């Protein structure tokens, strides 16, 4: 007997996500830069081992699992090539931070810093923002991610983001700049 409609839909979403990941690995300069930086920093990156597409809670788009050193792309919520590329880039920044900066994600200041960097180097980077709008995007994305991960309100998350913002916002490694590539 074949799978149910939901099983078939889930399999199709996972397959489409995997195709989008392959496209990003082949064509996105930002993704290539992050992967090359991981490899050259002594953090071997093997896509089949370090990236997984899977269904997630509807509130999520992806995540970085430091226990398994794996990026998760949510196949049920990331349905376009551009969204997969954005989330993959964002999560690769976390992977880079974990490997090269020895970030401990259960430390709130480490998490806030990595979320600021991921927003600055990936999530907010596709658009030519003016300075204020870009900074606002980074703070808003980082606070949103913190609120989801820590299950806290935006005000509490914003407090943690503001505490480490300047130092983390100005750390541009390994991309080297903000904005489009």
Question: What annotation goes with each model-predicted range?
Answer:
Residues 2-48, 52-72, 82, 99-181:
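Metalloprotease/metallohydrolase-associated module, dominated by Zn2+-dependent proteases
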Residues 86-98:
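Active-site recognition of the HExxH zinc-binding catalytic motif
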